[in-house]
């Protein structure tokens, strides 16, 4: 195990008030020690490393200049908030990041008063900050509100909606644009820093105020000319930008790693007290840790790693990852059908579409962090006869639900939805749990909804989706590796709305939707050993249901347990409605639905989360024993 780094100055800082007591000349050393602490902590827990390394100086500067927590500091997404956590009373728990019972990997209101708004999905910070600023103004307050948002998150429409609103309200709001990709504009050394200080200072602010006063004196007719003059002066100093057109006073770009540049600008903006203001800072993802600087994409999210070498620990896999199976299966189908195209919303590697893009670059579309646009873009492709696969994580598909309903389902457009990260996702916790997609998709008329029980089934579902042209179709699969089944070279086209029986029995029926099938098979062995002959079936489809299969299971078994990795209102609800309509609940059948708990579940290892939810083999056995009033056995299980 690596030795804990030597951090004498950081040891004096428990909360930001301690930081503000330091001399400004000490801050570079503090930043250096904070970076060492961050690398060491994440090396032991895994997590998001690169983004945090990129904002160390910015984090120090913000807490030094602003009076947090009275001044509200909002981090968009939250990947970059680990240094913030270390400086806000959570250093003693930083090595519990993303562990059961430990700190969240994102900002979280319940965790600290220094986290005024929870995050994990992108592009929400400006909207939340504007709401806080409006509330402050209604209450007569004077505190500052600062939203820190990355250039990637600025690709989402919500950020611009919020900025447009902030400009219209002339709200006193500070937005820090953290450009860690140099995708907008690089700073140009000392001149850039000088211009940023000039633009943020009182002299230029005085010019703005003079213009406003002159407008009020001369009347509205002079407003346009004066506004143009002031904007011309601003453009001469800072360069005209889209942000100015939205009503923001734009400062920068400035070097986000130079505290001598950051602190004067932040102080000027704080003291001027008018807004909205956007400060454009340029940072380097992975700054200060050579392996992360050299491969920012590989060190965005990491497993545990060796600090000296940067080598990440990875357990050997006995089966391929579901994401890779999806990608390889889609590539296989795309070789046969040049109408297949792939769409991702800024998650090419997470969804496996980076592999597809290597083979079919012209048929791969990364639309940025813009799930709403991604879905309607895919719908447009479908209208022209193409076969779009819009690969979106379950949790992120929630962001585009209106587009799924209005632009895809109502028009019966054949958009394919590969839904990765279905079910519990472990360390990323409640914000990334794939709980709701079956519930919100299977309720839509004409929508086909499937779930893969294993990696071979996933391959079949990719081909089934490619072959289906009568409307929208979705198939869900979890994070992680498959179960090690034999893999066909190419998938088969599944019969629509038909499941399969994988084990025959007579007393108990376990009907699985998704990858809990393996736990059902283990449970069936235990139940069989207890004298309870058990059938195990894989539903494959939540919509359309295999009504013949369900009818057969209901009529020939005493207990029917449905098992799924989704929330209430999903597969089991459709099964129960069918059973009720058919009168199959009136003959003594004991039905027990097993679903994800009706809570937002905190982070832990997925296997522990499923066990706690009663969705492992032991939980299934307990459910059956309880249904049969085997109280003693239920207690022993």
From Swiss-Prot:
Pathway where this protein functions: Metabolic intermediate biosynthesis; 1-deoxy-D-xylulose 5-phosphate biosynthesis; 1-deoxy-D-xylulose 5-phosphate from D-glyceraldehyde 3-phosphate and pyruvate: step 1/1
Enzyme Commission no: 2.2.1.7
Cofactor details (free text): Binds 1 Mg(2+) ion per subunit.
Chain residues that bind Mg(2+): 151, 180
Disulphide bridges, residue numbers: none
InterPro entries in the cross-refs: Dxylulose-5-P_synthase, THDP-binding, Transketo_C/PFOR_II, Transketolase-like_Pyr-bd, Transketolase_BS, Transketolase_C, Transketolase_CS
Keywords of the record: Isoprene biosynthesis, Magnesium, Metal-binding, Thiamine biosynthesis, Thiamine pyrophosphate, Transferase
Cofactor requirement: Mg(2+); thiamine diphosphate
The keyword Ribonucleoprotein is annotated on this UniProt entry: no
Binding residues annotated for thiamine diphosphate, in chain numbering: 79, 120-122, 152-153, 180, 289, 371
Reaction(s) catalysed by this chain's protein: D-glyceraldehyde 3-phosphate + pyruvate + H(+) = 1-deoxy-D-xylulose 5-phosphate + CO2
Signal peptide: none
Gene Ontology biological process: 1-deoxy-D-xylulose 5-phosphate biosynthetic process; glyceraldehyde-3-phosphate metabolic process; terpenoid biosynthetic process; thiamine biosynthetic process
SUPFAM superfamilies to which the protein is assigned, alphabetical: Thiamin diphosphate-binding fold (THDP-binding) (SSF52518), TK C-terminal domain-like (SSF52922)
Alphabetized Pfam families for the sequence: DXP_synthase_N, Transket_pyr, Transketolase_C
Example GO molecular function: 1-deoxy-D-xylulose-5-phosphate synthase activity
Organism superkingdom: Bacteria
Function as written in the Swiss-Prot or TrEMBL entry: Catalyzes the acyloin condensation reaction between C atoms 2 and 3 of pyruvate and glyceraldehyde 3-phosphate to yield 1-deoxy-D-xylulose-5-phosphate (DXP).
NCBIfam families: dxs (TIGR00204), PRK05444.2-2 (NF003933)
Family: Belongs to the transketolase family. DXPS subfamily.
Subunit note: Homodimer.
Protein name: 1-deoxy-D-xylulose-5-phosphate synthase
Organism, scientific name: Mesorhizobium japonicum (strain LMG 29417 / CECT 9101 / MAFF 303099) (Mesorhizobium loti (strain MAFF 303099))
């Amino acid at each position: 195990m690596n030795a804990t780094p030597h951090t004498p100055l950081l040891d004096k800082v428990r909360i930001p008030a301690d930081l503000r007591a330091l001399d400004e000349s000490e801050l570079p050393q503090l930043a250096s020690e904070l970076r060492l602490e961050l690398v060491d902590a994440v090396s032991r827990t895994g997590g998001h490393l690169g983004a945090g390394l990129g904002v160390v100086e910015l984090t120090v500067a913000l807490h030094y200049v602003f009076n947090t927590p009275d001044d509200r500091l909002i981090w968009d997404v939250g990947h970059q908030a680990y240094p913030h956590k270390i400086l806000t009373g959570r250093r003693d728990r930083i090595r519990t990041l993303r562990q059961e019972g430990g700190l969240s990997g994102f900002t979280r209101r319940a965790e600290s008063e220094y986290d005024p708004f929870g995050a994990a999905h992108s592009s929400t910070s400006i909207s939340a900050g504007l709401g806080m600023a409006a509330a402050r103004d209604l209450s007569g307050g004077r505190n500052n509100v600062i939203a820190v948002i990355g250039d990637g998150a600025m690709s989402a429409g919500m950020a611009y909606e919020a900025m447009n609103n902030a400009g219209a309200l002339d709200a006193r709001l500070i937005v820090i644009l953290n450009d860690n990709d140099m995708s907008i504009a690089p700073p140009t050394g000392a001149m850039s820093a000088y211009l940023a200080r000039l633009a943020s200072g009182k002299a230029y602010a005085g010019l703005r105020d003079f213009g406003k006063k002159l407008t009020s004196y001369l009347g509205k007719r002079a407003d346009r000319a004066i506004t143009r003059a002031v904007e011309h002066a601003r453009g001469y100093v800072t360069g005209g930008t889209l942000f100015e057109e939205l009503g923001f006073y734009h400062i920068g770009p400035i070097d986000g790693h130079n505290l001598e540049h950051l602190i004067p600008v932040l102080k000027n903006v704080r003291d001027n007290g008018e807004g909205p203001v956007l400060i454009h800072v340029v940072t380097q993802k992975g700054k200060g840790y050579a392996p992360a600087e050299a491969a920012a994409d590989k060190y965005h999210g990491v497993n545990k790693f060796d600090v000296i070498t940067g080598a990440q620990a990875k357990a050997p896999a006995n089966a391929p990852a579901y994401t890779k199976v999806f990608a390889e299966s889609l590539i296989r189908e795309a070789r046969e059908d040049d109408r297949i195209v792939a769409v991702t919303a800024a998650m090419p590697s997470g969804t496996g579409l980076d592999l597809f893009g290597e083979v079919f670059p012209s048929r791969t579309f990364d639309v940025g962090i813009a799930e709403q646009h991604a879905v309607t873009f895919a719908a447009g492709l479908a209208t022209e006869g193409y076969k779009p696969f819009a690969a979106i994580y379950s949790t992120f598909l929630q962001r585009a639900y209106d587009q799924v309903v209005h632009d895809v389902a109502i028009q019966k457009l054949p958009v394919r939805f590969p839904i990765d990260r279905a079910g519990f996702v472990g360390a990323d916790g409640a914000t990334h749990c794939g709980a709701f997609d079956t519930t919100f998709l299977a309720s839509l008329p004409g929508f086909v909804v499937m779930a893969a029980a294993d990696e071979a089934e996933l391959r079949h579902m990719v081909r089934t989706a490619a072959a289906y042209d009568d409307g929208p179709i979705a198939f869900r699969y979890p994070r992680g590796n498959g179960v090690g089944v034999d893999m066909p070279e190419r998938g088969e086209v599944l019969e629509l709305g038909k499941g399969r029986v994988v084990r025959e029995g007579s007393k108990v029926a376990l009907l699985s939707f998704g990858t809990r099938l393996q736990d059902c098979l283990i449970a069936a062995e235990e139940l069989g050993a207890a004298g309870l002959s058990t059938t195990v079936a894989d539903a494959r489809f939540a919509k359309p249901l295999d009504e013949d299969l369900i009818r057969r299971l209901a009529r020939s078994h005493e207990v029917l347990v449905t098992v799924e990795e989704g929330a209430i209102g999903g597969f089991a609800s459709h099964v129960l409605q069918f059973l009720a309509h058919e009168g199959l609940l009136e003959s003594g059948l004991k039905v027990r639905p097993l679903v994800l708990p009706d809570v937002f579940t905190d982070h832990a290892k997925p296997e522990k989360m499923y066990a706690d939810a009663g969705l492992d083999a032991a939980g299934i056995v307990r459910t059956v024993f309880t249904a049969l009033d085997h109280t003693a056995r239920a207690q022993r299980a």
